[in-house]
Amino acid sequence: MKKMFLFLLAFVAIVAEAQTKGNFEVLDLGSFKLHVYNTNDALGDASYIIEGKTGLVTLEQPLFKDNVSEFDAYVVSLNKPVQKIITDYHVGGTGNHDVVMIEGMPDFVKGTIYGGMMKNFAETFGNAIASMPTGKIEEIPMGSTQNWNGVKFSFQKGASTDFPAASIIIGNKVYYTHWTPVKSHVSHLQISSLAAIDAEITEAERALKSGCEYFIGGHGGAVKKDMVEFKIDYLKTMKRIIAANKTADSFIAAMKKAYPNLPGEAGLADLAKTLYK
């Protein structure tokens, strides 16, 4: 896992650039609404608002100041109180507001991997990102189910090779994990080993079995189950290709042949370097 986040530190140094503000979309799920905020920031982050009848729960608030301002203004426009602020995989610009985190994540955030990543963000992006949060942290037990604004939030262990954060089932209709499944080649930041492939397959199969209607992530927006099915098939195909190819170059060629014109081809070289060390 440490190798993957060292790659991330190098990655952010390359993608630092002027930002385009984000956009919102709203999904009406009957008993609650899911507001999806695609930040369009340099990290491809997404943030969410779960709107119940009497209040709001925010999830993975933005990190960049322009996005924080835009997100906060949108929250105010909903004219409902924010009951909980969930920080799961991504520490955001929550200021001095109290937040909810899965047990163990507050210590992990202070550690060398996550703490080093946030320090690098500060050095790379400077004043463009918000200061580290200073609010009180409420730790939620892994495996617990919370009921906020009449919506159930079930916290379960995420992919074993990722941060020690949680996948969250929201209202039995939305499944949140670190990376939204998309029809694209995976990043070397997500898959850094054969063990990571297996862990992501296990997590995706668990998501599919949840019966949820939408699948969301800290990177990417909201998708339906066909994207989860694609991810599972893609990763299993990747495992077979790795077993059949002994070099990075032959792996890249085989992946391109298996998925012609699939977005993300440019990232296959970095992925191959990671997998064929």
Predicted features, each with a name:
Residues 21-77, 166-179:
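Conserved beta-strand hairpin/beta-sheet module of binuclear metal-dependent hydrolase folds
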Residues 54-55, 65-108:
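Active-site metal-binding motif and surrounding structural segment of the metallo-beta-lactamase
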Residues 21-24, 28-29, 63-64, 109-233, 237:
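Metallo-beta-lactamase
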